[in-house]
């Protein structure tokens, strides 16, 4: 179930919340838009398999996705992607490549800007943690029905090596509108 980080009592900055209640991508001035949270996702590929996780807690708990999470102050997106893979799976991604970015606006006011990375390998042993259960998935059988609705719109570009820029509007777990451009 969807839950935003600020719902526990943190107040959203008014400049971040100003696009709350917008229900289409066209209603948002993306040049002025700012995310409440910068974050990353990293997808490790091994031959014809993709390393995914089933999230155990936080935003997207119960869903399948790539490892990732919110950036810490002073951290670059690449540093965050590596840290999150270590925390969630016990591995260090290698051959990290920036693949694209996705901007998400939720109608309740929460927003997140996700930098997406692809990795051609990793060091360490993949293990389950209290945050995530790992699963290697054949690239021709990605479990989109168990993922966020937007994933089926940009993950194929990631797998094909194409860079992308996505913008999405969500109400809870439901995607209301989207736009994905190739870079």
Summary of predicted features, one role per range:
Residues 1-21:
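N-terminal amphipathic/basic-hydrophobic helices that include classical n-h-c signal peptides
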Residues 61-63:
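A positional/architectural concept
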Residues 4-9, 160-183:
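Charged phosphate-binding loop/patch that engages nucleotide di/tri-phosphates or the phosphate backbone
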Residues 25-51, 67-70:
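Conserved N-terminal beta-strand and adjoining loop/helix that marks the start
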Residues 45-49, 120-125, 161-162:
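Short, charged/polar surface micro-motifs in flexible loops or helix N-caps
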């Amino acid at each position: 179930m969807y839950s935003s980080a600020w719902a526990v009592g943190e107040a959203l900055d008014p400049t971040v919340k100003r696009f709350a209640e917008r229900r289409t991508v066209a209603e948002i001035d993306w040049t002025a838009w700012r995310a409440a949270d910068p974050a990353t996702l990293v997808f490790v590929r091994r031959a014809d398999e993709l390393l995914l996780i089933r999230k155990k807690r936080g935003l997207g708990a119960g869903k399948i996705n790539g490892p990732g999470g919110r950036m810490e102050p002073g951290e670059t997106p690449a540093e965050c992607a590596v840290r999150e893979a270590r925390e969630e799976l016990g591995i260090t991604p290698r051959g990290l490549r920036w693949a694209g970015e996705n901007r998400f606006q939720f109608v309740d006011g929460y927003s997140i800007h996700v930098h997406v990375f692809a990795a051609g390998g990793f060091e360490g042993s993949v293990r389950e943690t209290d945050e995530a259960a790992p699963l290697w998935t054949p690239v021709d059988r990605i479990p989109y029905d168990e993922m966020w609705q937007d994933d089926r719109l940009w993950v194929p570009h990631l797998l094909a090596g194409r860079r992308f820029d996505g913008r999405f509007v969500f109400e809870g777990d439901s995607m209301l509108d989207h736009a994905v451009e190739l870079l």
